[in-house]
Every structure is written in structure tokens, then in C-alpha cells.
Amino acid sequence: MSITMRRTVLRSTVMAAATALAAAISTLPAQALDGQWCKDVHIRFFVGGAEGDAFGTIVYNGAKQAEADLGPKVDYIFSQWDVEKMVQQLREAVAVKPGGIAMMGHPGDASIMPLAEQAHKDGIRMMYQNVPVPKVTAAFGGGYVGAQQEVQGRALGAEAFKLAGLKAGDKAIMIGPFENESRGARERGTVAALKEAGVEVIQLSSPPSGEWASDPNLAIPVITAALLNNPDVKAVGYPGGQMLGNVPTYMQAAGRKAGDIFNFGFDTSPQIVEGFKGGWVQLTADQQPFLQGYLPILSLCQQVVLGLAPMNVDTGAGFVTPDNYEIVAELAKQALR
């Protein structure tokens, strides 16, 4: 076949494909192209924390915006970050047989697997946010919207080592749900990065019930004791925005002043912005929780109405520091970042 003929065939193939695509689009129901095109879809959405939770509120605001934009009927589920409660609520959600469920991945693959299997049998579309469940999605489908836990944790550890001016032999404290296979991967990654740089890391395990996230003041005695027993600690890492936003309280309870210790962690919030402003907080990793609310609902609507594949989006967005926090400050105060 000559080059000219090949070009002619290729051009004909492309034109045929374009014609077929246009024909396919023209057959979509009108509501798929208009506002509120997802109005006939019922979704159960897991917010994660309690109502008013610093992080969960941003997730919730993203989900509410998607609901307003697209029109589905959404039931919002609040779990106080309690993984056992999440599993029970997921069991109840599957029994209702909605069109789709957007589930927090905190309980992990093993706990979610049988319920994901039942959802698959019942034709319920699934999305997961904030914590990935790769074995579940490999077995029964579904997408994931959120940061990659270990990757983000390691990146934070490396950045903290650099910005805090740490060196081999220095001592740091890292708080986290280390025993949770899925959710704890992030903080384990931070610990690994610091240890590989030669830092001595004291690990403080947060309760599996998630109560420190629901009420950060409950951690005051543990953090205070750790700082008093280790007066040479140079840095402290926190597992989420709720605790990072409470840093002034922890430091003052231990008799420390702003800037005495390099405090770092994850997420943004109005409290964290104030922490930066007051010199209490030095570093946080942003994971754009608004997207973790908006995109799972968008993807479920696309799956149910348009037959599209589930979304997989890494929402890890880099770091916020004293040098750049003002860029996100106003949006953080509005619970949008």
C-alpha cells in the first residue's frame, strides 16, 4: 500500500470514528446534557467525621456543591471517624440499594470487601474517597478520589526534615493511627522518611475510634506527657487537620511558645491558618478535600447516567508553609480548602 493510500485510509477511518462519536452523543437523553441531569439518581455519601468536623466540613461542602450542580438525591452519613461505625453504616447503605455509594476507605480492604461484593451483585456503583482500598476496587470496581497515603506521608516527612533543619540524631514525635492498615499508611510513610534521614521518631498511636479527630482536646494529656518526657524534641507531626489546628493548645499545655517546636501535619482549616499566622504551625500537606466531596458524586452520576468508567484522581496538592499560606487562607476560612 502506498503512503498516499495509507493516508487516505487513515483519514477515512478518523472521519468515520468522528461521525460515530457524534451519532453516539446525539442519542444521549436530553437530561444528560442539561442542568440537573442526575436528578433521578440516589446516592449515599460518607462524610467521615461528625457534623462540623474541620476536615469533614470541607468534604461535605464539596459534596453539597456537586448535589446542587447535578441534582442527585444525596443522603449524608456522618461517622465520627469511627471505622466500626463506618462499616455498619455501609452495611445499611448497601441494604437500601441506592444508585451509588461514596464511601470513606478508612475501614480498609478486608472490612469493606464483603459489602463491596454485595453492592456489586446489586448493581450499586461505588466510589471511595480519602483512603484508598486497592484490593476492593481491583475485585469489584469503583474509583478513588484522594491523596495516595504512603506517597503523601513520605513526601511530608522529607519536607519536614528539610524545612525544620533537622539532622541525623535529632528527635521528633509523630502521631497517627499506625495500626490501621489502610489509613495509617500515610503516617507510617512520614515515620519511614524521617527514620531514613536518621531522625529518632517517637510514635504516638491515636485511638482507632477516631476520637482524637472528633475532639482534639482529648489528646492533650498524651501529647503533653510526650513533650515533658522528651524536652529535646525538635518537631511534632499530626495525623489530620483537626489536631494540627489545635497545636497552640498542645504547645501551651506543655509550656512551649510559638516557634519552639516545628509543628507539621496534613490539611488546611481556619484553625490551621491561624496557627500559621501565630507562628505555631510551620508545614502542612494539602489534599484538597473539597474535591474528595465533589468528584465522587460527579463520578457516580456519570457511571449511572452515562455509563462512564469510575474516576481515579490523586488530590495531593503539595505543601502549605508560612511563606504561602495566605494564598489559601481565605478559602480555608470558608471551608473550601
Which sequence ranges carry the predicted segments?
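Bacterial N-terminal signal peptides
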Residues: T13-S26
